[in-house]
Each structure stands twice: as C-alpha cells, then as structure tokens.
C-alpha cells in the first residue's frame, strides 16, 4: 500500500499467489459473508441485502466440510443469518461486533481450536472486525496526515486526512492479526499442511467505496499460500469471486462440488494450470436498509466495468455516510472539484463504463462515447443474461415491500 505497510500480508503473498482481479459480489458485510460461506451469487442464496437472511434451504461451509470430516470454526465477526444455516463452532478471542470501539483480541481460542485433535482436519475462519468503522484500533499516530496520499474520489480536507489515518491504523492492526495467526501455525508445525487464504471484506467506509459497485467497493485483496501446491511468488490476473472459495475448500477436502454452487474451485489456478477462471465478474447492490432503495447491477471483463444504475432518477443516500464527520467536511467545500466528486457520488447516470486499466479509480465515464458503444452493448447483454439466469428482476426486486397485513389495511382505506 502507498500509505500503509502490511508486512505480514505481504509475506503471505510472497509465499504463495497474489490475485490481481479478485472481487466480492456485494460491497457490504452480511451479503459478502453469505457469498463466501454458501458459494452462491447474492440473488441465488437470497440474503443479498445487508442484515438479511439466506433462503431456508441454503447450505454453507460448516455443513459441507463437516460432512467431509472437518471441524469448522469461526472466530470474530459473524454477521450472517439465520444462524441455523451456518453451524460454525464459535471460537472465542476476537470481537464479534463490528461497530464496537473495543478492538482488543487474544489468540488463545484459535490456538486451542487448531491443536485440539491432530487426527481431524480443521477449517478456521478468522473474521476480523478491522478495518470496519469506527476506526478506533491500531496506532494512528504513526501517520503524518499531511503526507497521506488520498484516492482521487476523496475530497481533501483535514478531517478526511484524520479519519483516513485512523482507517489505515486499523489496516495495520488487521495485518498484525494475520501475522499472529501465521506464527501460531508455524509454532504448531501446521504451516506445511495448511491452505491459508486472506481476503478483505469490501471497500473502506468512505463515500464511493463500500456500498457501491465501483472498483473501490467490489475489488478485493486476495492472497493464498499452500506449501507444496502453490509456488512462492505467483501472481494471476484471472477473474475470481468470493463464491469460488467454498468450492475450493470442498475440492481440497476431497469432496464433490454440488451443482447448486455458483463458484468454481481455484485449485487449477493455484497450481498454475490456467491463467483464466471466470470470463466476467458480476455485482449487485441494494441500498436497503442502509438508505432508500438504489438498485445497481454491474459486470467486469477484467479490462472494462459496466455499471447499470436501475433508478438513475433517484438521489443516492447512505445513512451512515451522511452523518460522518468527514462527509460533513466534504459538503462544506465550495470548489469545482468538490462539486464534481459529490455529484458523482449522489447523482448517477443510468450507465457507467470505465476502462479500469487506464482509469482504476473510475473517474472518466465512457458510456456515452461512440467509440465504446460496442463494448457497452456487449457487457449490457451479458449482464442482463446473468440477471435472467439468477432470477433477478432488477429494481422491483430491490424495493422494500410492506408486510401483507399493512398492504391489506392500506387497500381497505
């Protein structure tokens, strides 16, 4: 990272493979986890809105690997529903509440889980709450606010720099947790026989990242290490999504990946047998319950990203961001650049098209340029094809519906 040093995550990447085109499908907490643990795209598992539940018949990681003889534990943040569909063993030591100001943790629980029964293989999810807001962990004093390099979609204010330093401090704390976990594996002589995958959750909780379908929200950090299988120092630009993790684990455990799972095993990518994986990455967004409905769908082929804002006549509002101190400092700025950034965030056209190689921060919309009309048409067609396959009816699917009794009462009046 330009601003922050992540020595433990960097070391993990050097030991194995770095994914340059890894994506989540929904850039918010609960549905991201649902996708990881079920291997299904958001509309397929049903829990595509934040704080929502997956469909009753959906199975998940602990069930699949449990049936293959593994014990499956989860330490840290849960944020999945309903719990009956996710029968993880609860491993203590890491905070579960993502908005808690307390970021203290200990590793005793994960140590005991790892060494409990040497005859039984294990799968452990260490789900850190860092770097989720309110950014109270780590040491922010190490960052010189004036020297921080802000992303171009940020409005540069003193308050922004202060909160960005706090965010980076929590990234540093997350990196330390990765180092702690790797040290335990080493001390327990488990490192040589363990597949370790690190992924980020979603983009940072600044405007234009989390809760959006721009790259800053859906593009993810992902590295994997597996001695004897993954060669050190590998990199890949293969398009992968979080739905690929569960089928990978099933494959590694010797199981057969069921047809209901949307993702594909990454083992061939790990072994360098292929340089490609998916042709496209897909993303959905539904703002409810974080604000008024604002449905978005998007697709990327690795070079271009198409974003389809299904209700462009609406103004985008995300309730957590609206109250943030740094965001209030943005609104107070009266410059052309500040107005441009705020308008990009709040008022969006129906279609956005970006060359993510030349314009990684997606500041130059190509959707209305004749030169890119063929690419726009191709990606629009492929996105609509995927939506149909996923039984995604678009804007109507995302608008909240009143409970049946309230609907009946309104009709009688």
Role assignments for model-derived ranges:
Residues 1-352, 360-399, 403-413:
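Formylglycine-dependent sulfatase
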